[in-house]
């Protein structure tokens, strides 16, 4: 369905996804402040995921899976030098942590991890916003 969106609909979807990224970063901060670190890291991942989706949609690139979104980011933006490799690593690591937290047992994120990845996620989303302008 998304593949057939007209230009205006794609622009609206891009805006919606970036707004979701901003909202989700805020959710992550609230969760971290209440010491819900697994949930905070989960929300950091989703904030980045929504931002990446916005970037892909803007360029007419669509994927139905989380792994596909990660692959498309790497293929179309990281490997071409449009997005720094470190941003790609941040997104990949958050993907792994989120996946483990959702599907594996005895996975615990902590304050240090949240404190490390929050500014990385914020910088990553800021970079994507620059590319969307």
Task: Give a label for each model feature.
Residues 1-133:
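Terminal alpha-helical segments
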């Amino acid at each position: 369905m998304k593949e057939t969106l007209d230009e205006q609909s794609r622009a609206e979807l891009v805006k919606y996804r970036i707004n979701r990224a901003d909202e989700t970063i805020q959710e992550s901060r609230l969760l971290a402040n209440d010491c819900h670190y697994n949930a905070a890291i989960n929300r950091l991942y989703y904030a980045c995921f929504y931002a990446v989706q916005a970037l892909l949609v803007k360029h007419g690139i669509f994927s139905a899976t989380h792994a596909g979104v990660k692959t498309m980011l790497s293929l179309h933006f990281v490997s071409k030098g449009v997005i720094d490799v470190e941003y790609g690593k941040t997104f990949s690591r958050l993907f792994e942590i989120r996946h483990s937290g959702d599907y594996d047992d005895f996975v615990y994120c902590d304050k240090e991890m949240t404190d490390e990845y929050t500014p990385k996620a914020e910088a990553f989303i800021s970079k994507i916003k620059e590319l969307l302008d």
